[in-house]
A protein has these predicted regions:
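Canonical P-loop GTPase G-domain recognition
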Residues: 16-18, 159-224
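Helical mechanochemical/support elements of P-loop NTPase systems and associated helical scaffolds
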Residues: 98, 115, 204-207, 351
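Short loop/turn segments at strand-loop or loop-helix junctions that form parts
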Residues: 83-88, 125-127, 155-157, 187-193
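Conserved G1/Walker A P-loop phosphate-binding module
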Residues: 2-92, 287, 291, 346, ...
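Short glycine-rich substrate-engagement loop in P-loop NTPases that contacts/grips substrate
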Residues: 63-65, 95-102
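Conserved C-terminal guanine-recognition region of P-loop GTPase G domains, centered on the G4
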Residues: 77, 100-184
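Conserved protein kinase catalytic core
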Residues: 56, 90-91, 130-133, 162-163, ...
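Alpha-helical membrane association modules
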Residues: 209-212, 221-402
Length: 402
């Protein structure tokens, strides 16, 4: 009986995942994640925010006051809202009132009927060199944790003695366990490289990727795609999410969502492909207008005559296992088949996979070529992206054979 129950649960999870993937087709915009970054003054909150989400996310004076005690940082091109607690000095009587107000604000949001309006995770920052986890600060953490929002303690500025930092983390874990808060995750972070006098090389930044990964595991599924797009630490997470987007389009194509399938080149003005390209670009913080995407599609492409190279092996293209399995219906034929032998929906699915992967490969190369400031120049982005896509299409045509 227990095995049957487990199987039922697995099937239910798979159905929910399928619905989530299919919703990617219809959704217009990425969901915006709300992250509370709390901690006393001097713990490096702004440095942490900028390191994870971009250099200008928490620029001085750019925060919008939500309440007397909370500033909100947002950027129209980045699907994240950061709530930053301001001016906390835990020894003052005034701050104790601030703590109550902050808790009330988060609790109010958490009970909202709009799941996108809630606080989705809390990062509580503690300077690793303070060796202090008691009194008003511990009370504050206990109050915030009691709300039930996913909670992570971030030990910041971890450039000191490794053994001492580890001992401090263990002390925090022990206290948390005694107080029934052992579900709180702890991540050690050095947000920026640090150079000490007499040392030949700086201590490199570390821990940001772990913070992103731990946060993703705790976030509700409906908000994860927005957080992945917003963060700039883990390119592998961005690519994984893009592969899920492509997968949802491949599956939809196999079900017949394309009324008319081009025989040779999909890079024509097609609303569905434009929408997919826009979503893939957003995952890499490359926000492209419909006009820009149309220009990319019209100026990218190769004459493949009657040889549809999108039928080359998914293994050669580096497709994910999930997409490979979806496209593997002609496994016995090894994909060396004529266009006329492939049904319309299957042809559409393979074309979507091919051009989707070509696009994300090109975006990743674009990131390597351009600086952060150059990536804000839309004309430059479009021009360079067209060059990269055409180069990759020619390379892949050669791989498929004329």
């Amino acid at each position: 009986m227990s095995n049957f129950t487990g199987e039922e649960k697995f099937n239910q999870q798979q159905e929910e995942l399928e619905k989530d993937l299919d919703s990617r087709i219809d959704s217009a915009d990425l969901p915006v994640a709300n992250i509370m970054v709390a901690g006393i003054t001097g713990t490096g909150k702004s440095t942490l925010i900028n390191a994870v989400f971009g250099a200008e996310m928490a620029a001085t004076g750019s925060g919008r006051p939500v309440t007397e005690h909370i500033d909100e940082y947002e950027n129209e091109d980045i699907p994240i809202h950061i709530w930053d607690t301001v001016g906390l000095e835990l020894d003052s009587e005034k701050t104790k009132e601030s703590i109550k107000a902050i808790k009330a604000t988060i609790a109010s949001k958490s009970s909202s009927n709009d799941k996108y309006d809630r606080v989705h995770a809390i990062w509580y920052c503690i300077n690793s060199g303070s060796n202090r986890y008691q009194g008003a600060e511990l009370d504050f953490i206990k109050e915030l944790h009691s709300i039930g929002v996913p909670f992570i303690i971030v030990l910041t500025q971890c450039s000191g003695d490794e053994d001492e930092v580890n001992a401090f983390e263990e002390a925090i874990k022990k206290i948390n366990s005694e107080m029934g808060m052992d579900d709180i995750k702890i991540v050690q972070v050095l947000a920026l490289p640090v150079k000490y006098r007499g040392m030949p090389t700086p201590i490199p930044a570390f821990g940001l990727d772990e913070l992103v990964n731990v946060t993703l595991k705790l976030l509700p599924s409906f908000i994860k795609s927005g957080f992945i797009a917003a963060q700039k630490v883990s390119q592998s997470e961005k690519r994984r999410e893009c592969e899920e987007i492509i997968c949802s389009y491949v599956r939809a194509a196999q079900k017949g969502f394309w009324e008319k399938v081009p025989l040779i080149n999909v890079l024509v003005t097609d609303d569905k492909i434009m929408k997919m390209f826009r979503k893939l670009g957003e995952m890499y913080n490359t926000v492209l207008s419909p006009k820009s995407i149309e220009e990319i599609m019209k100026k990218s492409g190769v004459d493949f005559k009657n040889n549809f190279f999108g039928l080359i092996s998914p293994i050669d293209m580096g497709y994910s296992k999930k997409i490979t399995e979806l496209l593997n219906k002609k496994k016995d034929d090894g994909f060396s088949v004529k266009v006329s032998d492939v049904e319309k929906n299957e042809r559409a699915a393979r074309m979507i996979a091919f051009y989707g992967y070509t696009f994300i490969d090109s975006i990743e190369e674009l990131w390597k070529k351009l600086t952060e400031s150059q990536l804000k120049d839309v004309d430059m982005v479009v021009s360079v992206l067209i060059q990269i896509i055409n180069k990759k299409l020619k390379e892949r045509k050669a791989k498929a054979g004329d």
